[in-house]
């Protein structure tokens, strides 16, 4: 199935995943965890997926220095030069810009798919066909492409893409991007039929994204473009360590996709989910007749419904009379909170960090 040596994949794997605390922590973020007991972490599943359509030697992992050993342990088939290690976190635009310069040094004709490391894809065959079709689209045009997912509910945790006129077989010009709307607006979006979820998956030719960075993110370009003679060499890491921390902290959505006038979307339904929250994990997990989820743990549940329980496999959870709760334990932390209040988890993480600092 893998044929085109000009096709590359960049997997972004440097996030902390604080919304999945206490399981996902700075020392072991969610992309390195196996949530469903498959024997493969989210990162490994993402790699397994893309190596079916991208030459394995053309797959890059961009992550933080902290996770170098984790990536090497989970993906031992990668060569050291396929793992790009950021000295500090600077959001997705600098991450993608660096990977683009690196790839351009290897292959100035490269077509690139950029993907997060924590997505779940249930309809893999349809997804991979869309990736190949999208890479072909960007190889023949100076356009930036994203994948749009048909929404099945008014989700407030995703960004939305409004489509304009068609530009070929299932490709549409993007009219607007909207970041994580309130519930009422999300309902309007879904009912209109014009809006699709923003998957966070992108495709483009390497020269197209470099030109977009030059035009829309000149401050970022000024930090990374001077390294064009060292990308792909042994001097690259030193250059990045010295210059990457000075890059602006900006997302690819805000910095490029919302501002460029050559953005298109390919629409699909791949059984896609951004596994970003406990709520999304609950939605995807098998449930008992009362809507309770118990992941990889023993449980006795009475008079309760719509809960998610995630404990170490040597613990037994006995639950009576709860509705709509998250019960999660990892290491020395037990978290119990309303499932629909999980947006406060980042506050708990900050409070825990402050307690440790003061203590």
Regions found by a protein language model. Give the residues of each.
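Left-handed beta-helix
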Residues: 1-6, 207-357
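Conserved N-terminal catalytic core of the sugar/cofactor nucleotidyltransferase
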Residues: 1-11, 19-26, 37-116, 122-132
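Residue-level signal for inorganic ion chemistry
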Residues: 43, 99, 118, 161, ...
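A residue-level structural signature of the nucleotidyltransferase/glycosyltransferase Rossmann-like core
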Residues: 112, 194, 201-202, 273, ...
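Conserved core of the sugar-phosphate nucleotidyltransferase
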Residues: 124-244, 264, 314, 355
């Amino acid at each position: 199935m893998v044929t085109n040596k000009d096709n590359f994949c960049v997997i972004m794997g440097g996030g902390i995943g604080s919304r999945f605390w206490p399981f996902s922590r700075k020392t072991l973020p969610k992309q390195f965890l196996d949530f469903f007991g498959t024997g493969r972490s989210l990162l490994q599943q993402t790699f397994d997926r893309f190596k079916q359509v991208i030459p394995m030697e053309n797959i890059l992992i961009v992550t933080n220095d902290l996770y170098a050993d984790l990536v090497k342990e989970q993906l031992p088939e990668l060569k050291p030069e396929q793992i790009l290690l950021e000295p500090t976190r600077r959001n997705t635009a600098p991450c993608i810009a660096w990977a683009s310069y690196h790839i351009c040094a290897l292959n100035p004709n490269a077509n690139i798919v950029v993907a997060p490391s924590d997505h779940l894809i249930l309809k893999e065959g349809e997804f991979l066909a869309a990736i190949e079709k999208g890479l072909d689209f960007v190889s023949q045009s100076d356009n930036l492409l994203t994948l749009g997912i048909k929404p099945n509910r008014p989700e407030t945790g995703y960004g939305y893409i409004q489509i304009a006129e068609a530009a070929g077989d299932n490709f549409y010009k993007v009219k607007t991007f909207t970041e994580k709307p309130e519930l009422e607006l999300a309902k309007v979006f879904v009912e209109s039929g014009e809006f699709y979820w923003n998957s966070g998956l992108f495709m483009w030719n390497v020269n197209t994204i470099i030109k977009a960075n030059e035009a829309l993110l000149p401050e970022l370009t000024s930090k990374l473009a001077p390294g064009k003679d060292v990308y792909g060499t042994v001097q690259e890491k030193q250059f990045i360590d010295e210059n990457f921390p000075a890059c602006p902290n900006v997302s690819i959505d805000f910095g490029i996709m919302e501002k460029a006038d050559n953005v298109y979307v390919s629409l699909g339904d791949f059984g896609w989910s951004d596994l970003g929250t406990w709520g999304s994990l609950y939605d995807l997990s098998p449930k008992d007749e009362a809507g309770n989820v118990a992941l990889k743990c023993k449980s006795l549940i009475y008079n309760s419904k719509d809960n998610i329980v995630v404990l170490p496999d040597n613990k037994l959870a006995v639950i009576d009379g709860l509705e709509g709760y998250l019960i999660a334990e990892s290491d020395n932390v037990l978290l119990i909170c309303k499932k629909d209040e999980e947006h406060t988890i980042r506050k708990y993480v900050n409070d825990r960090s402050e307690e440790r600092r003061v203590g």
